[in-house]
């Protein structure tokens, strides 16, 4: 059985996903059962770091979500809209969603989770939090009977970067706010 994947976004993360799907050799056996059926991009003329069949690439993300050959929607376009609307449309169509979009999960995560629960589909977001560490599903499934009172640690790559750099560059003349702003700009 082949599972059709619809990919929303073909930037750095999307191109990486497409590359994995295009060359599953040496990867988990289930990757071979996945087929990239449709890809939506903002700019059809922009050069891409991965070569895909031209007939699967388009600039209409809603068409990717609605395509009956797409079984799972992977959203890596970032930002709040149209990401939120596309995720909700996929859920309404009964399609599981995988997202690496921190912004949409932070702002609309409760709404998305409620829609997914109501429709009975998965929304996987490990790629958006904790540096891709598979922590969300184990917390939801395996530890449901436990009462977790606190999770502590550096669970975000940006936070880790800021803490590491601030330790190296802190001086009495710099305010913490100034340092954080400078480091965030430096990281971009």
List each language-model region with its residue ranges.
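Short acidic, glycine/serine/threonine-rich loops at helix termini
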Residues: 18-19, 49-52, 109-112, 134-141, ...
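A short hydrophobic/small-residue beta-strand
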Residues: 96-98
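Short glycine-rich anion-binding loops that position phosphate/pyrophosphate groups of nucleotides
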Residues: 44, 78-80, 103, 128, ...
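Structural motif
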Residues: 8, 75-77, 100, 107, ...
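N-terminal glycine-/serine-/threonine-rich beta1-alpha1-beta2 phosphate-ribose binding loop
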Residues: 1-93
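Rossmann-fold NAD(P)-binding glycine/threonine-rich loop
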Residues: 83-89, 102-131, 136-139
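Rossmann-like NAD(P)H-binding beta-loop-alpha module
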Residues: 119-120, 124-167, 171
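Positively charged, low-complexity/disordered segments
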Residues: 172-188
């Amino acid at each position: 059985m082949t599972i059709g994947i619809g990919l929303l976004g073909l930037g750095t993360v999307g191109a990486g996903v497409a590359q994995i799907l295009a060359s599953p050799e040496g990867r988990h056996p289930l990757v071979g059962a996945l087929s990239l059926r449709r890809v939506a991009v903002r700019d059809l003329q922009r050069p891409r770091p991965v070569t895909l069949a031209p007939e699967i690439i388009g600039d209409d993300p809603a068409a990717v979500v609605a395509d009956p050959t797409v079984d799972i929607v992977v959203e890596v376009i970032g930002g709040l809209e149209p990401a939120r609307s596309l995720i909700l449309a996929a859920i309404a169509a009964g399609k599981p969603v995988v997202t690496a979009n921190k912004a949409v999960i932070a702002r609309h995560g409760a709404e998305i989770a409620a829609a997914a629960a109501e429709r009975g589909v998965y929304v996987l977001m490990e790629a958006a939090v904790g540096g891709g560490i598979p922590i969300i599903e184990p917390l939801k499934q395996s530890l449901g009977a436990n009462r977790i009172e606190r999770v502590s640690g550096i669970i975000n790559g940006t936070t880790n970067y800021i803490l590491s750099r601030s330790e190296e560059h802190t001086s009495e003349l710099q305010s913490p706010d100034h340092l954080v702003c400078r480091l965030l700009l430096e990281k971009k």
